[in-house]
Amino acid sequence: MSKIESALQAAQPGLSRLRGGAGGMGYRAATTQAEQPRSSLLDTIGRFAKAGADMYTAKEQRARDLADERSNEIIRKLTPEQRREALNNGTLLYQDDPYAMEALRVKTGRNAAYLVDDDVMQKIKEGVFRTREEMEEYRHSRLQEGAKVYAEQFGIDPEDVDYQRGFNGDITERNISLYGAHDNFLSQQAQKGAIMNSRVELNGVLQDPDMLRRPDSADFFEKYIDNGLVTGAIPSDAQATQLISQAFSDASSRAGGADFLMRVGDKKVTLNGATTTYRELIGEEQWNALMVTAQRSQFETDAKLNEQYRLKINSALNQEDPRTAWEMLQGIKAELDKVQPDEQMTPQREWLISAQEQVQNQMNAWTKAQAKALDDSMKSMNKLDVIDKQFQKRINGEWVSTDFKDMPVNENTGEFKHSDMVNYANKKLAEIDSMDIPDGAKDAMKLKYLQADSKDGAFRTAIGTMVTDAGQEWSAAVINGKLPERTPAMDALRRIRNADPQLIAALYPDQAELFLTMDMMDKQGIDPQVILDADRLTVKRSKEQRFEDDKAFESALNASKAPEIARMPASLRESARKIYDSVKYRSGNESMAMEQMTKFLKESTYTFTGDDVDGDTVGVIPKNMMQVNSDPKSWEQGRDILEEARKGIIASNPWITNKQLTMYSQGDSIYLMDTTGQVRVRYDKELLSKVWSENQKKLEEKAREKALADVNKRAPIVAATKAREAAAKRVREKRKQTPKFIYGRKE
């Protein structure tokens, strides 16, 4: 379009205003004009003019397009400072191109306007403008300020027409964008305010634990949400969902929240065109998490409740009887179910389950322990019965062992232990002490069990402890130089020893000196203080005095004609010397000392004599070396075995000189030897016990054979008797089954 045509068209609005018309839509009625004949010259001139105008327009458009490209190049290549400096220096690219400079100023103005509006838009997004007026005032001031600042920054006159045209361009679109953004912000703020108000209102109600626990709390919440959606207090379904989620989250952290959530979960709400329950709206996983939090909060928000809960569980766990603990935990569980009625796992329920598992384990262990204790108790009673029977057999003369290792074992007793023997001994001694019989009878009964006991048995240990205590009482008196007023162990030992001194001496040979002391006080009437003083002198003897005593002792032995002294076993020499010295220093009488020593040796040894007419002594052997079992009197069986062995060896070796064998003890062995040393047979306690056991088995076998023979002798008589009885029984049965009238008499 040419400038002339543009000017003509642009003049019409002005013309309308001059005429006072309203302008309207610019409608004009169509006019027709008769064709005027035109000459070919005029037509040619017109076409020429039009062609020139079109050429000018095309050239101008090309110039403006090139100017647009050049202005873009300048903006791209140069910073604002460089452009300003280039303008001032006259070195700006394409500064001779007026179209390029015009386009540059227009674009600079447009960019400046967009920068200002971008700043305003950012402020809108940040929520700076709470009202429309605030936004408009700020934008107006920024536009005025920005137009000047940006123009000066690029070296352009702020009042430049092209710059102003670019700065003011697209104002409508920019306004729409800014006002729309601010309207959206205000709408969001209004919605947030509504949600905030609703949340504040709900919190005012739901923060009260008593309100949350009320049965109608769920109904209130349901109605509040429904009314809010209807009245617009809750602007949208999305915000309703947000409000509901937030309300449930808040309630779950408060006391009573678990009760509220339990009731409201199945209430219905319509959102986004669908009706669901609140549980379905939140989602099962999230709902369970809320319930766990709510039930945990019951305790976390109530310190006293939490403290009581912990103390109750600890109290239950610390009960000695797991049955009591289990009952307490069941009560705690019932209380917890009231506070946390749902099935979700909470820390409190975990504590309870853990406590229940511990108590169950304790219960299992306790049950097993009780069962074992009951079994042990029954077995203990059975053991005591078995032990008592063994002791009674032994006391009655049967050769049975009373060692716990040799007790008969069955499923009702289990394996025997030394503690079982101790329990039996304590029980039996207590029974004897509680009997209403004289003390002498009690001591006699105790000695029977003592004699029947095994070597290291409980009875011997108990009496041995008493003997040891008595020895310590005397030793303490020797050190102190005076016998105390009370000597309970010595008194008890004196009483029980007087009942059978030989048995006590045989069982505790290392206490021979103590037994001698008691005999000197009780039987010889020597003052205890005299004996104490003598013992103190004996302890304080010098080396020379000991040497003289040794010589005197050897002389006394050599002068004695007693076989027990002449053939004194080496194992008894030290004990014999103690007795000799004790009597000598206490009484000052060497003859009495020899007499007591001889008495001790006769009680502690057995003298073997030959088979000749003279009956010469062939050996002196300690009695305890000949014991075949734990019974002190079993040395007699060992003696008989040695006698049989001696006679058998002599009979099988007739060349032995004088048909005699010498017997002597050395260490733990007993030897039988002829005068030449060619025959030398060794025995010890183990071998004697073995021979005795074999002899017992042979005797038992003979007894069984004899009993069987007696039974076989009686068998025919017994069989005949049984046959007669069976025949008579058959006759009686037959008569019962047969009618009596067939025999000619009807009754």
UniProtKB/Swiss-Prot annotation:
Q: Which InterPro entries match?
A: Gp15
Of the GO CC terms on this record, one is: host cell periplasmic space
Q: Which domain of life is it from?
A: Viruses
Keyword check for Zinc-finger, yes or no: no
Q: Name one GO biological process term.
A: symbiont genome ejection through host cell envelope, short tail mechanism
Q: Mainly resides where?
A: virion
Keyword check for Signal, yes or no: no
Keywords in UniProt for this one? Answer: Host periplasm, Viral genome ejection through host cell envelope, Viral penetration into host cytoplasm, Viral short tail ejection system, Virion, Virus entry into host cell
Q: Where in the cell is it found?
A: Virion; Host periplasm
Spell out the subunit comment.
Answer: Homooctamer. Interacts with gp16; after ejection the gp15-gp16 complex composed of a gp15 octamer and a gp16 tetramer probably binds both the viral DNA and the host inner membrane. Interacts with gp14.
The UniProt entry's sequence similarity note says: Belongs to the T7virus internal virion protein gp15 family.
- Explain the purpose of this protein: Component of the cylindrical core that assembles on the inner surface of the capsid during capsid formation and plays a role in viral DNA ejection into the host cell. The inner core is composed of stacked rings of gp14, gp15 and gp16 proteins. Following binding to the host cell surface, the internal core is disassembled and gp15 is ejected along with gp14 and gp16 into the infected cell. Gp15 probably remains associated with gp16.
Q: What is this protein called?
A: Internal virion protein gp15
Give the organism, scientific name: Escherichia phage T7 (Bacteriophage T7)
